[in-house]
Amino acid sequence: MSNILTEICATKARHVADKKKHISETDLYNLTKNQTAPRGFRAALDKKRAEGKFSLIAEIKKASPSKGLIRPDFEPILHARSYQEGGAACLSVLTDQPYFQGHEDYLIAARNEVTLPVLRKDFMIDPWQVTEARAIGADAILIIVAALEDNQMQEIEAAALEYGMDALIEVHSTQEMERALRLKSRLIGVNNRDLRDFSVSFDRTYELIKQAPKECTFVAESGIQTHDDLVAMNQHNIGCFLVGETLMRQKDVKQATRDLLGLN
């Protein structure tokens, strides 16, 4: 595990422990009953691909540890609407506060504004967080293989599947891909950014997709900037992408989304 990931997970563990003191899992579970059914995150990605289109998970992201503040005029509702109108298949919303200036309220607001499925982008270390994710309306959660032991991944995935949610399993290496494929989920993401030094390379993604069974929905994450990047990856049978910073830095987010997808 990288130093930054170790630090983030340690901070997350403290925050989750503190949250548990204030609300029980039973109370959280009762809140999940007030939510509409999960919208089908992976299904939405697969549908776009079946239509011969690129599948975009568009990320609502205010800041990051490596880049600092990304979007000063941060408006989750407006960004969600722009992404949907721009042609995104799904949304991803950062809810981590200390490192990404995210918040659960951003996900709630974004999901209420659109009909797209929404991923809770956070560092999941405890099944309790999955219940919390469903309680705020998330349709999918992220599992970062580098951050967890196998038994932790299995418990978190099981909690997500029990709620009818999808789990996006993020890997960075051959070894992590092998571990990911022991899980039930077949929604696999490869982070093009090396968390050790934040460098970006698509080569890792091109190699790892060779390990993925054909039934997997394979998502390329991070460092994607142009429509040409999508075209290049499509030549390697990669048609699903998670993009945040590139779009969040643009004045016209809707138009930037359309440009990225080649819809103009």
Curated annotation (Swiss-Prot):
PROSITE patterns from the UniProt entry: IGPS
SUPFAM superfamilies membership: Ribulose-phoshate binding barrel
Catalytic activity: 1-(2-carboxyphenylamino)-1-deoxy-D-ribulose 5-phosphate + H(+) = (1S,2R)-1-C-(indol-3-yl)glycerol 3-phosphate + CO2 + H2O
Superkingdom to which the source organism belongs: Bacteria
Keywords: Amino-acid biosynthesis, Aromatic amino acid biosynthesis, Decarboxylase, Lyase, Tryptophan biosynthesis
Keyword DNA damage listed: no
Tagged with keyword Lyase: yes
Pathway annotation: Amino-acid biosynthesis; L-tryptophan biosynthesis; L-tryptophan from chorismate: step 4/5
One Pfam family named in its UniProt record: IGPS
UniProt GO BP: L-tryptophan biosynthetic process
InterPro entries (UniProt xref): Aldolase_TIM (IPR013785), Indole-3-glycerol_P_synth (IPR045186), Indole-3-glycerol_P_synth_dom (IPR013798), Indole-3-GlycerolPSynthase_CS (IPR001468), RibuloseP-bd_barrel (IPR011060)
EC id: 4.1.1.48
GO MF, one example: phosphoribosylanthranilate isomerase activity
Entry similarity comment: Belongs to the TrpC family.
Protein name in UniProt: Indole-3-glycerol phosphate synthase
Originating species: Zymomonas mobilis subsp. pomaceae (strain ATCC 29192 / DSM 22645 / JCM 10191 / CCUG 17912 / NBRC 13757 / NCIMB 11200 / NRRL B-4491 / Barker I)
Lineage summary: Bacteria, Pseudomonadati, Pseudomonadota, Alphaproteobacteria, Sphingomonadales
